Amino acid sequence: MAELDPFGAPAGAPGGPALGNGVAGAGEEDPAAAFLAQQESEIAGIENDEAFAILDGGAPGPQAHGEPPGGPDAVDGVMNGEYYQESNGPTDSYAAISEVDRLQSEPESIRKWREEQTERLEALDANSRKQEAEWKEKAVKELEEWYARQDEQLQKTKASNRVADEAFYKQPFADVIGYVTNINHPCYSLEQAAEEAFVNDIDESSPGTEWERVARLCDFNPKSSKQAKDVSRMRSVLISLKQAPLVH
């Protein structure tokens, strides 16, 4: 009885002719082992080809131009007839997909509105910068005018004060109160001012005012400590003569 091989085919007699599919007898290579070895060789070749295509970053290399990755149904990465190739990892891929989705889903009216808004904001910024420059220039001009008005008002006030001083020192007893306006020397004393006022009054004197002019030269302050002698009696006499001059 003939022996069976692993696939169930009867083995021929030793030295006999080849059987069935032309495989030799028991002394030749096993067909199953040859098939398994061929499959392992093909798988190893495919793995080696894919290994050479891996880039340094770990992402698969770019595929040939044509069908996008993932087959005909993968249209998310298509833009202008060409598919997007990932270059810098998943972040760029997600950003590109989001941008493509936005461009594909954004209506023309919204895109036009966004452009108009950009132009309007630029115009507003330019207008605000122009107004700011004008306001600064106007503020500088108004400040200069304010300083000019202040200086003019100060000069007028000084002139008015000088006129008021002259009018004040021309009235009676001005020599006792203070200096006259035409005194420029710092050592000009109150007595010298009173004497000058008395000399000026001589030409303008009228009858009956002699004792009044004399009283101007006297210090009627009872608390004065400059006097060494008691002159209260003389003071009272001069006051009475001032009030009731002697009749000649």
Swiss-Prot record:
Highest taxon listed in the record's lineage: Eukaryota
Residues making up the signal peptide according to the UniProt record: none
Keyword Membrane: yes
GO molecular function: clathrin heavy chain binding; GTPase binding; peptide binding; protein-containing complex binding; structural molecule activity
One family name in Pfam for this protein: Clathrin_lg_ch
Residue(s) carrying Phosphoserine: 105, 206, 236
Modified residues (N6-acetyllysine): 223, 242
Keywords tagged on the record: Acetylation, Calcium, Cell cycle, Cell division, Coated pit, Cytoplasm, Cytoplasmic vesicle, Cytoskeleton, Membrane, Mitosis, Phosphoprotein
Subcellular location, record wording: Cytoplasmic vesicle membrane; Membrane, Coated pit; Cytoplasm, Cytoskeleton, Spindle
BP term (GO), one: synaptic vesicle endocytosis
One Gene Ontology cellular component annotation held by this UniProt entry: clathrin-coated pit
InterPro entries reported in the protein's UniProt record: Clathrin_L-chain
Region (Disordered): 1-93
Involved in binding clathrin heavy chain, as annotated region: 100-162
Biased segments, Gly residues type: 13-25
Keyword Endoplasmic reticulum: no
Oligomeric form and interacting partners: Clathrin coats are formed from molecules containing 3 heavy chains and 3 light chains. Interacts with CALY; the interaction stimulates clathrin self-assembly and clathrin-mediated endocytosis. Interacts with CKAP5 and TACC3 forming the TACC3/ch-TOG/clathrin complex located at spindle inter-microtubules bridges; the complex implicates clathrin triskelions.
UniProt function note: Clathrin is the major protein of the polyhedral coat of coated pits and vesicles. Acts as a component of the TACC3/ch-TOG/clathrin complex proposed to contribute to stabilization of kinetochore fibers of the mitotic spindle by acting as inter-microtubule bridge.
Family recorded in the similarity comment: Belongs to the clathrin light chain family.
Protein name: Clathrin light chain A
Organism of origin: Rattus norvegicus
